[in-house]
Amino acid sequence: MENKNQKRFVLIHGVCHGAWTWDKVKTQLEVAGHCVTAVDLAASGINMTKVEEIQTLNDYCKPLLEFLSSLGSDDGKVIVVAHSMGGISAALAADSFACKIAAIVFLTAFMPDTINPPAYVYEKLLRSIPQEEWLDTTCVNYGKPDFPLQYTLLGPKFMAKKMYQNSPVQDLEVVKTLVRENPLVTNNLAGTRSFSEEGYGSVTRIYIVCREDLVEVEDYQRWMISNFPPKEVMEIKCADHMPMFSKPQEVCALLLEIANKYCKN
């Protein structure tokens, strides 16, 4: 029998990670009776694209855009949940498929506005972090010399100290074997044209603040919220940059609350 209360979630991972990031949350949402798709962006997870093949933000987000394009009117609207750099991917998707999205949930994610270039919020944070704080994270230029792009690989020490400090140690050990080189969403990758008011700007947004994030620190998350106010702000205490590992039950509970409130399929 069809579950009339079933919601459809689309989960977007952050830089260097993959769909596997969401395994704990995905399982809990499915047990609650919902349909969940966690997407591997290009050159992420099991997606076979090479990072050097990614020349634009559209290239990087191609798997997400193709999935949303495949949804028909019978599928109902989806709740897009974006983590970290995935917030910029979610905004791009909303610009093309606003009519298919009930809401975007930014889980300690970069939340672009509709005035500045897509990479504005990321590059603002980047300027505020001293180079030495990236520890063993590497960053490499690729592409054309006169139009350089960049990819990164998060270092084990950086992940342990800045990203997973409240998460189970055994989870981090697995993560170290799964992260891949990913493009950084710079102005050269994303372009300088802002996301549109009629597309991305028309979609309901909810921001979940992670109080103990040491990458996108709470003050910075609050700045993004004031820069482009969402419909609602929630928070998770004691959550690090990876709340799907440090606080999966709390993440799931908030997503279910959001789905019931904002998705009326």
Swiss-Prot record:
Q: Which GO terms describe its molecular function?
A: hydrolase activity
Active site residues per record: 84 (acyl-ester intermediate), 213 (charge relay system), 241 (charge relay system)
Q: Could you list this entry's UniProt keywords, alphabetically sorted.
A: Hydrolase
Q: Where does the source fall among the domains of life? A: Eukaryota
* Gene3D superfamilies assigned to the protein according to its UniProt record, in alphabetical order: alpha/beta hydrolase
Pfam families attached to this UniProt entry: Abhydrolase_6
Q: Which residues form the signal peptide?
A: none
EC number in record: 3.1.1.-
InterPro entries the record matches: AB_hydrolase_1 (IPR000073), AB_hydrolase_fold (IPR029058), MES/HNL (IPR045889)
Q: What does this protein do?
A: Putative methylesterase.
Q: Its family?
A: Belongs to the AB hydrolase superfamily. Methylesterase family.
The name this protein goes by in its record: Putative methylesterase 6
Q: Which organism is it from?
A: Arabidopsis thaliana
Kindly list the organism's lineage: Eukaryota, Viridiplantae, Streptophyta, Embryophyta, Tracheophyta
